Amino acid sequence: MLKHYSHDGSVEIVCNKTDNSTKFVFYLGGDAYSAPAILISDGEASKLYYLHRDYLGSIVMLTDENGNIAERRYFDPWGQLIKVEDAAGNTLDKLTLLDRGFTGHEHLQTVGLINMNARLYDPALHRFLQPDNYVQEPLK
């Protein structure tokens, strides 16, 4: 899978090399961390979803344009994905509509990590995989 991002973060283009498909995600009214809604399109058909976030900014539910639940997500306090449910309450094995979840960041589901932009975070270890490049007080 290959992903492209717009300069302002309002559009993601996801190219799936396995099935040769392309998906466009438009963040409406903000970027991936603040938008209240998204429009997902394959270039022909499109679907509007509203993003429901918790106090950390994690996307915990997506609803369609009629207010029906499309996907519900549950995270532990460290960002580990506990459960994903579809509209009927069936358990899914991964995030299906949007790969952003904990604190609005991108989940790299094949390896179980979260891309926090500057560093990768492992929710199972509760640790970042790289040191912080910006250390304010190195002697403390």
What are these model-predicted stretches?
Residues K3-Y5, F102, Y121, F128:
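Conserved hydrophobic/aromatic "anchor" residues
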Residues N66-N68, P77, G89-N90, D122, ...:
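A short acidic/small-residue loop/turn micro-motif
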Residues L2-Y74, I82-E85, T96, H107-N115, ...:
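Short, ordered secondary-structure scaffold segments
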Residues K94-R100:
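Flexible glycan-contacting loops in extracellular carbohydrate-active proteins
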